[in-house]
């Protein structure tokens, strides 16, 4: 049974959500603060964590940092603040998705399933002798070969690295900061225009209509996402 750890100090939100999750076949555990969340995760683990950003005693961002330091468990950040900066911070800390209050419990459960499914798909892709697939794109990492709809394409090293990282996180929003750190390194001192140029070049090679991309899409104010 898939286990969900709900970290939420508002019982009026947490209890009905836990009830609905159990009806849908999940195992749900509710804790109301950050230290309890970390202790429960150490004790029992979880397949996915729903993490409120505003918690008493320890913020959700601090909890996320500590979770990421010890585990790759999927995290969905739940926040009452709808600002872009909060979403960017959550994603850069390693959250897999974010939901803004008030939310539909049914929508949240759908997002939980989507995040879990993406994780399973990415694990399967990574286990297949270094072969990744997303939409029409197929990448053989070890042989450094990429094809689109079965036709080989040529990618310079940085474009290859960028596409590989996007494919390993297919369906997940990646911020510009995450992409730059991964492909150019944390000590990169340029601006984000370099990333945008590389994205434009990738689109010209993997999209049927690069001006209206459907695979490598922009998530306004956040970054980019490669659709599977």
UniProtKB/Swiss-Prot annotation:
Origin superkingdom: Bacteria
Annotated Response regulatory domain residues: 3-116
An example molecular function term from Gene Ontology annotations: transcription cis-regulatory region binding
InterPro entries: CheY-like_superfamily (IPR011006), OmpR/PhoB-type_DNA-bd (IPR001867), Sig_transdc_resp-reg_C-effctor (IPR016032), Sig_transdc_resp-reg_receiver (IPR001789), WalR-like (IPR039420), WH-like_DNA-bd_sf (IPR036388)
Post-translational modification: Phosphorylated by SenX3.
DNA-binding region as annotated in the record: 129-228
UniProt name for this protein: Sensory transduction protein RegX3
Organism: Mycolicibacterium smegmatis (strain ATCC 700084 / mc(2)155)
């Amino acid at each position: 049974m898939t286990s969900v750890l709900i970290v939420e100090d508002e019982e009026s939100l947490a209890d009905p959500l836990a009830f609905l999750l159990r009806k849908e076949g999940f195992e749900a555990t509710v804790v109301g603060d950050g230290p309890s969340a970390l202790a429960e995760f150490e004790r029992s683990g979880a397949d996915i964590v729903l993490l409120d950003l505003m918690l008493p005693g320890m913020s959700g961002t601090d909890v996320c940092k500590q979770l990421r330091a010890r585990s790759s468990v999927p995290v969905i950040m739940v926040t009452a603040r709808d600002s872009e900066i909060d979403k960017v911070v959550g994603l850069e800390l390693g959250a897999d998705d974010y939901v803004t209050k008030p939310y539909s419990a049914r929508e949240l459960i759908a997002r939980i399933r989507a995040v879990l499914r993406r994780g399973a798909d990415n694990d399967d892709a990574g286990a297949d002798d270094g072969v990744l697939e997303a939409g029409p794109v197929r990448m053989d990492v070890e042989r450094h070969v990429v094809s689109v709809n079965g036709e080989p394409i040529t990618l310079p090293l940085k474009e290859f690295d960028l596409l590989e990282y996007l494919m390993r996180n297919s369906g997940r929003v990646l911020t510009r900061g995450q992409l730059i750190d991964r492909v150019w390194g944390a000590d990169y001192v340029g601006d984000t225009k370099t990333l945008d140029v590389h994205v434009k070049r990738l689109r010209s090679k993997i999209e049927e209509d690069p001006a209206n991309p459907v695979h490598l899409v922009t998530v306004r104010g956040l970054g980019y996402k490669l659709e599977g």
